[in-house]
From Swiss-Prot:
CDD domains hit by this protein: AAA
Name of the protein: Insertion sequence IS21-like putative ATP-binding protein
GO BP terms: DNA replication
Gene of this entry: tnpB
List of residues binding ATP: G114, D115, S116, G117, T118, G119, K120, T121
InterPro entries: IstB_ATP-bd, P-loop_NTPase, Sigma_54_int_dom_ATP-bd_1
Keywords per UniProt: ATP-binding, Nucleotide-binding, Transposable element
Keyword ATP-binding: yes
MF-aspect GO terms: ATP binding
Family that this chain belongs to: Belongs to the IS21/IS1162 putative ATP-binding protein family.
A Pfam family: IstB_IS21
Length: 199
């Protein structure tokens, strides 16, 4: 039977290896995972599978939280709370179809049109959230925010970071399009962006 000192050394080495291999969940929860393996009398392959599966689940969770953080969502975006009793808006069947995200996989553009207060921003935010949950990189911003980013990206580090996120996004929702008057150079900037993103 191995001494406590030897076991402690192994745990320390395993933790360091996990950190060096960029397996933060394993490094942080090694004691708990080892204890669970002993309790369940896991085989080596069961233990290894447990380690890797839990690391993978944690990586997926962290990736989701990062995508959600950068998505630019407002406080309310849960499509389950959408009021279908409105006379203007989409019905439940249309909402289910949109939430399936087939339109993203087929690279269709989606245009939400309606009067102020009809829920366009809410629906766009909810669809961004659905896309993030499905593993897509998605981003919501107003047209004004988009133009500030496009016009200042060469001189502003935060604007350049935003621009890079926009360029990597698989779904980009532009809000308040009708509230921002477009000038000639703005139209050209928007056209170039759409060309780059879709090209």
């Amino acid at each position: 039977m191995k001494s406590l000192e030897t076991m402690a050394r192994y745990k320390k080495e395993l933790t360091e290896c996990a950190r060096n291999l960029k397996l933060p969940f394993l490094a942080e929860h090694l004691d708990e995972i080892l204890h669970e393996a002993q309790e369940k009398q896991q085989t080596y392959s069961e233990f290894l599978s447990t380690c890797l599966m839990r690391e993978l689940r944690d990586k997926e969770r962290r990736s989701y939280l990062t995508r959600l953080k950068f998505a630019g969502l407002p406080a309310r975006y849960d499509l389950d709370l959408y009021d279908f009793s409105r006379t203007e808006g989409i019905d439940q069947r249309q909402m289910r179809e949109l939430r399936e995200l087939v339109w993203i996989r087929r690279t269709y553009n989606l245009l939400l049109v309606g009067d102020s207060g009809t829920g366009k921003t809410f629906i766009a935010s909810g669809l961004i959230h659905e896309a993030v949950k499905a593993g897509y990189k998605a981003y919501l911003l107003t047209l004004e925010e988009l133009f500030v980013c496009l016009k200042t990206k060469e001189i502003s580090r935060p604007a350049m970071k935003t621009y890079k996120r926009i360029m990597k996004a698989q779904l980009l929702a532009i809000d308040d399009v009708t509230l921002f008057p477009l000038k000639g150079e703005d139209v050209l900037l928007l056209f170039k962006l759409v060309n780059c993103v879709q090209g």
